[in-house]
């Protein structure tokens, strides 16, 4: 905890979140292949931590050094490094444990020294045909600025070519852009065992085939390494350059940014390590981490199953939403009543189908959507292009600064513009993180607007693994305000008022304060008062102070926080009425929801915004009331199920101990599975009421 005992540093809280991910890899009740994939998720998270959080603290240190500041950031950086090293040590222990567990199931992840003669012959052939064409050594000399050529977050093999007392060094990029990281080695017929080798080890086995005939050496050794660069970039914000041009330049900056982490194989010779640090300009503020033979463990997210179903999670087929059934089109269904989709339990196909129908429906005159992250081959985006071809007015607000998706969004922007879509890049200096879709139809009574307000991205792939809400409504008051958000994006200086939607940066802080203050006043008046909050991150000090005030006034507060949480629960007289859990399971918890008791007339809101200063004050975010009583109760039920979790819920406390919620005599409840069953029953009940046939699970 910081000197201010009321707040946990967000960077340390983030590492505590990633420790919860590592707990899933350690959990023996999780299927084996899924445990290995959690190692990949942990590693991918840690890569992003160094690119973003670590880099930010390092920059603060350098600024303080230039301006004569204090050592607070240095102290924080030291704590971050210490915690990250401990997590890496635990990671290595778990990796070795999982390798042994796989071997007990006749699955072997082998290195180059464990191959039999037949396997060696197969490996040599595979290398010559598939791998060697993608290998070009980068020889390290004093004249070459290797920092210009080394790719961020790529795994390399650093090669030592020794001849007597002299040594030359070279770098080999492991070509995972062209080849799979995991290679199945054929076995003799009738053998039960499955053998997998990493591409890294195939290259190690064939090092001589790369260098022989070009260099003289007595000994050849390879060592794993990886470098992480600072992910930030500066935009010039100059009038003569478009945002698209500025972003392209910014991404070029990222390609050559200075390193913030260097991970190397711990057996690497000292002279070689010193030379690489010199060539890569590694400073003492950067993180130098000794590791094992393999880096870029994020690739383990895609670790292959070898044909044994029990080693993976049982599939949960996405549910078809019965509210759409029995209507000629999606618009008739939405006009009849508001519809709530909860991914990945519900199929995202409902959204792609809605946009597909809008693309050719003769009544549709316009489509507006804002895009933060989308799939590479997005059907939804292609439907928007089809809509333009069919004469619809299509406006797409593309967020070019969606971190690590910038290149994909630039490419989509070009494709959409070429097709005739009106592409807008939003408000300078302010990310657009809202999840809005607005479709306008010309109907008998005039123009009718249909709106989507969501907590997650329009991304077909992540909708299968992220939990999120989509609210579809023909409520003309809400739809008019969604139209107002698009107007605000196009002209942020034009005065506009929102009576129903809560929109960052216009009124989010004041409206959230108003909602929390009302619960405080009700508690002080002796009335029942409660707040239920679910977000990814809670770090905004102003909102945390309000929550402390609410707790002190007697408001009962329950929260589900997946990631960073700077609020300290359980402080005497300050946060005793605050209970916080975090759920890490097969799906990534992503919705933002607020429920306030409101003197017995609960108000429910869904939002795109986390409770962070950037989201409340410096981004365009949308929080919407849920007005349909049926849907309000459904969201409250889902949150209630999560608070009964006795399998995957951890308590958030001031020590960041990540203890699982005590089960006691209660039965096991795994909330994600329980929510799936709950929604399945909801759909079954809806079909029964409508007299419709239950679909076959295989078709859901």
Swiss-Prot record:
Catalytically driven reaction(s): [phosphate](n) + ATP = [phosphate](n+1) + ADP
Cofactor entry: Mg(2+)
Post-translational modification summary for this protein: An intermediate of this reaction is the autophosphorylated ppk in which a phosphate is covalently linked to a histidine residue through a N-P bond.
GO cellular component: polyphosphate kinase complex
Domain of life: Bacteria
Binding sites annotated in the UniProt record for Mg(2+): 373, 403
Domain PLD phosphodiesterase stretches: 428-462, 585-615
Disulfide bond residue pairs: none
The enzyme's E.C. designation: 2.7.4.1
SUPFAM superfamilies per record: Phospholipase D/nuclease, PHP14-like, PPK N-terminal domain-like
One Gene Ontology biological process: polyphosphate biosynthetic process
Residues where ATP binds: 45, 466, 562, 590
Assigned keywords, A-Z: ATP-binding, Kinase, Magnesium, Metal-binding, Nucleotide-binding, Phosphoprotein, Repeat, Transferase
Family per similarity comment: Belongs to the polyphosphate kinase 1 (PPK1) family.
The protein's name in its UniProt record: Polyphosphate kinase
